Amino acid sequence: MAEHESLEFGKADFVLLDNVSLEEFMANLKLRFEKGRIYSYIGEVVVSVNPYRAMNIYGRDVIEQYKGRELYERPPHLFAIADAAYKAMKRRNKDTCIVISGESGAGKTEASKYIMQYIAAITNPSQRAEVERVKNMLLKSNCVLEAFGNAKTNRNDNSSRFGKYMDINFDFKGDPIGGHINNYLLEKSRVIFQQEGERSFHSFYQLVKGAPDAQLRSLHIQRDPTAYNYIKVGGQLKSSINDSAEFKAVADAMKVIGFTTEEIQTVYKILATILHLGNLKFGTDGDVTLIENSKLVSVLGDLLSTKEENVEKAMLYRTVATGRDVIDKQHTHQEASYGRDALAKAIYERLFCWIVGRINDIIEVKNYDARVHGKNTVIGVLDIYGFEIFQNNSFEQFCINYCNEKLQQLFIQLVLKQEQEEYQREGIPWKHIDYFNNQIIVDLVEQQHKGIFAVLDEACMNVGKVTDEMFLQALNGKLAKHAHYTSRKLSPTDKNLEFERDFRIRHYAGDVTYSVVGFIDKNKDTLFQDFKRLLYNSSNPVLKAMWPEGKLSITEVTKRPLTAATLFKNSMISLVEKLASKEPYYVRCIKPNDVKSPLLFEHERCKHQVEYLGLLENVRVRRAGFANRQTYPRFLQRYKMISEFTWPNHDLSSDKEAVKRLLQGCGFEHDVAYGKTKVFIRTPRTIFSLEEQRAEMVKRIVLFLQKVWRGTLARMRYRRMRAALIIIRAYRRYKVKSYIREVIRRFKNVRDMKDHGKHVKWPTPPKVLRKFEEALRSIYNRWWAWTLIKPLSPEKTVQIRAKVATLECLKGQRADLGLQRAWEGNYLKKDSPGTASSFTLVSSDLQRKDKFMRVLFSSNVRKINRFNKAEDRALLITDRHLYKMDPLKQYKPMKSIPLYNVTGVSISPGKDQLVVFHTKDNRDLIVCLQGMVPAGDSRIGELVGTLLSHFKSEKRKLQVNTVSPIHCSMNGRKCTVVVETKISQSQPDFTKSRSGYILSVPGN
C-alpha cells in the first residue's frame, strides 16, 4: 500500500477508501488530479490521469527513488509498476507484460515511453557496450514508429494510429539483449482522408517542413503542406509537435538503429511519391481516361525508379487474364481515382510494415543459446489504440473498439473472473462480486458464422456486385435479436441512425454508431496486381523487396487473400494468448477532459471511463482478495531458507504443513490463508518482509557456498598443481637423463680423437638445462685446453697462458699480436749478443738485491724523460719491478718502479710499438719498443699478455686500454700521445706537441 503522501493528496491507493462507492472513488480521483498527483493505485494496478502538461517526475533522481523498491514504499508512479514487472521477471524467471489501456488521448503512448525509459535506466549496471546499444535502439525505435504511425486527431495531438506490442528480451542477469515489435491495423485510410481538424501521419509534415532544401528539390517537393491534396484534407496543418525538429530526430534515430543511407533515402522517396499521387488528376476525352498533369508521371517514375510509361499504364489500365489471353482494360475516371488512392494507402502500409520488420531484424535476439546463456525472459509492453467514438465511425474505429473489447475481456478474465473463481476453487471464504462480462460483445463481433466479421467476410465473397447497404441488411437479418446491436431498421424511432447506413453497438465503454460506408471495400483491401508488378520491377532494391507478390505471372491463378477483418481478428486472438501467457501488470489511463486542459476535470466524462474500465469492481475484488498467491512447492522453493524447519528440506507431512510452520515462525499467520494447493497472502507488505528475510539469508548461504566452493576449488587446484609438478619433475628428469646420455654418447671417444672432440656437435639442451649446458661446455673447454697444455713444459705453459690473455684482451683491437711466433720474453739477452754479458751481470745483481724470481720482459725502448726529451733506454720487467736502464753505460739501472705501483697500460690500435705504463702517482712511463730482431717484429701483444698473466696469477687487475690518442700523466701533468706515420721517418721517435707528444713512426 502506498506510503509517504499526506492526506491532503487523498488516498494514494483506492483500496484504502473508507467507503467503496463510485462517489468516493470519483472524489478521491478528482482531488489527486487537482493536487498534481496523476498516479494512483488499485492494489497493483496503476490508474493514470492525463495531466496535459509536462511534469518533472521522470528524471534520473526519481528513477533512483523507485529502483528496487516495493510498490507500497513510494508514492504511486509508472516507475513503480515497471519496477514490479522487472523484479517479477528477474526474481521468478517468469515472463511479464504491462498492459496500458484507456481511450484515445488518455496518455497511453506517453506512459509506454516512460516505462521503456525506466527499464533502460535501471539495467546494465556494468555498462556493457552491446547492452547499451540494444537499449539505445529500443528507445530510438519509439521515435521512428511515432513519426510513421501517429497522427494528430481532434482528441490527441500524438494519437497512435496503429497498435504496438513490444517484447523486450532479457538475459539471466536481467539486462536487455534484444526485442521484437508486433504492429496491428495501421489506419492507412488516414493517408488519403482526415476528418475536419485532424492531420495525416506526422511523417508527411516532418518531410515537408524539416527536410533540407536540396533534399526537397531531389524529391520535387515544395515546402508547403497546402500544396498536397492528401495532407490538407483535414484543414489542420499546425500541431503542438515541432515537425522540423522531429524530422532531424527521426533521421538520426534511423541511423542509430541501423538503417542504411540508401534505405533512409528510399523511405523519403516513398513519402514524396504518396504526396505526388494525391495531386495526380484524371480527366476524360470521350471514352478515354487521361492524366491531366502528365509531368507528375515522370516525377513518379523517377521516385519509384521505374519507367515513366510503366507508371502511366498502371494508372490508366488494368491487365486482365482470361485463360491464355491477356488484355489491357482501360480504367474509367472513377476506377483510376480509386486505384490511385488504393496505391497510396498500400504503399504507406507496406512502408510502415517494412520499417517495423527492419527494426525487428536489427533488435531481435541473435545467437542466444539458453544452455549457454541461461533462460531468456521477456517483458511485454502493450501500447495500442484506445476506445474511439468519432463523429463518423468507420471500419477502422470498429476494429479499434473490437480490440479494446478483447483487452477488457482479458482484464476481466485475469483480474475479476479468474481471481474469484480461484478463491472458490481453493476453498478460500469469499463473497462474490458482480461485474459486467463483455464476452457477449466480443462474440457479437468475432463469433463464427454469426459475428459481424463473419457476415462481412461472407458479403465480400459473394459473386456479383455487393454493396455496403447489402451488408447492413445481412447484419439486420442475423443480429436483429441481439441486445447489443441495433440499426434504424430495427429501431425506426431512433432518428440518430441513418437508414441503410448506420448500425449501433453497445460497447462496454458506451454506445457507438458506425457507418457501413466503405466497410466492404476496406475489408477486401483491393489493390490491382498491375501496381504490385510495377513496384516489384523497380530498380530500387528496397522498394522491390516490399512487393514480393509482384513477381507472379499475369496468368497465374492465386488463392483469395484473407480479408482485413479476418487478419485483424486472428492477430487480436494471438495477442491475447500472448498476454495471457505472461504475468500481467495494468496501467489504466483516464482522459480528464476533451479540450486538453491541465486544469479541467470533467466529472461525467471521467465517471463514464471509471465505470466502463471496471475500476470500482477492481477495488472491491482487490480489497476483499489477496495480493499474492503461490503453490506450496513454489513458495517453499523460494522462502524455505528463512526457517530452520524447512531448510534445506523439511520432514513434515506435506508442503502445506511446512509453509504453515514457516509463516507461523515469521509471525504472518494473521495475513495469510491456506488453500488446497496454494498459499494466499493478503498484503504486499508481507511479501516484502519475506523477500527481505530471504535476501538476508541468501547472503549468508552464498557466503557459505562460496567458502565451500572456494575450498573445493583450492583443493582441486592444489591437486592439479601437485600432479603437474610431479609430471614436470619426472619429465625434467627424463629430459636431463636423455640429454646427458646423448652428450655421453657423442663425446664417448673424444680422448682418442685428434682434435679431442672439437668437431663434435653438441645436442640441443632443454630450456631447463641451458645454464647446465653452458657449465658443461666450460668444463669441456677447460678439459680440452688442459689436454693441449698438459704435454708442454712449464715455460711453454706460461707462454700459452700469456698468449690466451692477449687474445682475450686485444682480439679485434690490434692487427698483429705476435701470436704465431715463440715468445722469448727477455729480448735484451737475445737482440744484443755483444752486450748480453753485461746485461746478464746487471740482471743477476738486481735479482740478488731485489729478490725477484724471474724476468717477465725486456727490450730496448725509446722513452721520454722528465725534461720532455726522447732518449734510448732499456726496459726490464721482473715479477717485482719495472727497471729503466742505460744501454750505453753497460745497462746501468737508472730508476725502478715497483710493479704493484703499475695500474694499467695503454696501447694504440695501430702497428706501432707505443706503450704507456700508468702508475698510481700519475707519473706515467711513455716508451716505444725498438731494436727488434728481426726488424718489424711486433712485441706489444707479448708485453701485454705477459703482464696480464702475471697480474692474474697475483689476483690483481691490470687495466688495458687500446685507444688513440692515448691520455696519460707526465710528472703529474695531463697530456696526450698521438701516433703519426711519416714516409721519411727511419726510426720511431717522440717530439713535443702543444697537448703532449707525437710518436712518429716509419710508414709507406
From Swiss-Prot:
Gene Ontology CC: actin cytoskeleton; cell cortex; cytoplasm; dendrite; early endosome; extracellular region; microvillus; myosin complex
Subcellular location: Cytoplasm; Perikaryon; Cell projection, Dendrite; Early endosome
GO MF: actin filament binding; ATP binding; calmodulin binding; microfilament motor activity
Domain IQ: 699-719, 721-741
Keywords attached to this entry: Actin-binding, ATP-binding, Calmodulin-binding, Cell projection, Cytoplasm, Developmental protein, Endosome, Motor protein, Myosin, Nucleotide-binding, Protein transport, Repeat, Transport
Stretches for region Actin-binding: 572-594
Keyword Cytoplasm: yes
Primary localization class, coarse: cytoplasm
Domain Myosin motor positions: 9-695
Reported function: Unconventional myosin that functions as actin-based motor protein with ATPase activity. Plays a role in the formation of Kupffer's vesicle, an organ that functions as a left-right organizer during embryogenesis. Plays a role in vesicular trafficking events that are required for normal lumen expansion of Kupffer's vesicle. Required for normal orientation of cilia in Kupffer's vesicle, and thus for normal, unidirectional circular flow and normal angular flow velocity, which then mediates asymmetric gene expression and left-right asymmetric development.
Binding partners and assembly: Interacts (via the two IQ motifs) with calmodulin. Interacts with F-actin.
PANTHER family according to UniProt: MYOSIN, UNCONVENTIONAL MYOSIN-ID
Protein name, as recorded: Unconventional myosin-Id
Upper taxonomic lineage: Eukaryota, Metazoa, Chordata, Craniata, Vertebrata
Encoding gene per record: myo1d
